[in-house]
Amino acid sequence: MGPRSCTHFATLFMPLWALAFCFLVVLPIPAQTTSLQNAKDDRRLQELESKIGGEIDQPIANLVGPSFSLFGDRRNQKTMSFGRRVPLISRPIIPIELDLLMDNDDERTKAKRFDDYGHMRFGKRGGDDQFDDYGHMRFGR
């Protein structure tokens, strides 16, 4: 077995090692992908529980907490064919009731602030008619 046969073996086994490396490292194994999906689902569930926990009173949150931990394993739910525990509802940051109570007159002030050419108007401060639309004092009338 000379040096020539060693190079022959090396050239034979190089593609095999590369192929084995691809199978082991590059291609995802189904068990790993399901565990990654489970980890993502668990993280999403924890974020949802933290959002719900912030909205619930503290004594009620203590009662609800253990029930969530009993059913925390998502794999058991999939085998038992449970649906989603908590429906995902998109809610605005400011509640509707508070939005009705707030006085947002930004649209009204913006309409008064600029003229048709985009120039800022300084007139009509406080409802006075002593200034014109460009902020110049009117002496007539």
From Swiss-Prot:
Prosegment residue ranges: 34-73, 86-111
A cellular-component GO term for this protein: extracellular space
Keyword vocabulary terms for this entry: Amidation, Cleavage on pair of basic residues, Hormone, Neuropeptide, Secreted, Signal, Sulfation
Positions where Sulfotyrosine occurs in the chain: 117, 134
Protein family (similarity comment): Belongs to the gastrin/cholecystokinin family.
Record carries keyword Signal: yes
Major place of residence: secreted
Organism, scientific name: Drosophila melanogaster (Fruit fly)
Protein name (Swiss-Prot/TrEMBL): Drosulfakinins
Subcellular location, record wording: Secreted
Top-rank taxon: Eukaryota
Keyword set includes Nucleotide-binding: no
Disruption phenotype: In adults, RNAi-mediated knockdown in insulin-producing cells or all Dsk-expressing cells, increases total food intake and the number of feeding bouts over a 24 hour period. However, feeding them the CCK antagonist SR 27897 does not result in a further increase in total food intake and feeding bouts, as in wild-type adults.
Record-linked Pfam families: Sulfakinin
Known role: Involved in diverse biological roles including regulating aspects of gut function, satiety and food ingestion, hyperactivity, and aggression. Regulates gut muscle contraction in adults but not in larvae. Functions downstream of TfAP-2 and twz in octopamine signaling pathways to modulate feeding and male aggression.
Tissue occurrence: Expressed in larval brain tissue localizing to cells in the anterior and medial protocerebrum. Expressed in cells in the brain lobe, optic lobe, subesophageal ganglion, thoracic ganglia and the eighth abdominal neuromere. Drosulfakinin-0 is expressed in the central nervous system including the subesophageal ganglion and an abdominal ganglion.
Recorded GO MF terms: neuropeptide hormone activity; neuropeptide receptor binding
Protein's gene: Dsk
Swiss-Prot/TrEMBL GO biological process terms: adult feeding behavior; adult locomotory behavior; inter-male aggressive behavior; larval locomotory behavior; multicellular organismal response to stress; neuromuscular junction development; neuropeptide signaling pathway; positive regulation of cytosolic calcium ion concentration
Residues that bear Phenylalanine amide: 82, 122, 139
Signal peptide: 1-33
Induction: Up-regulated 24 hours after starvation and then appears to return to normal expression levels 48 hours after nutritional starvation.
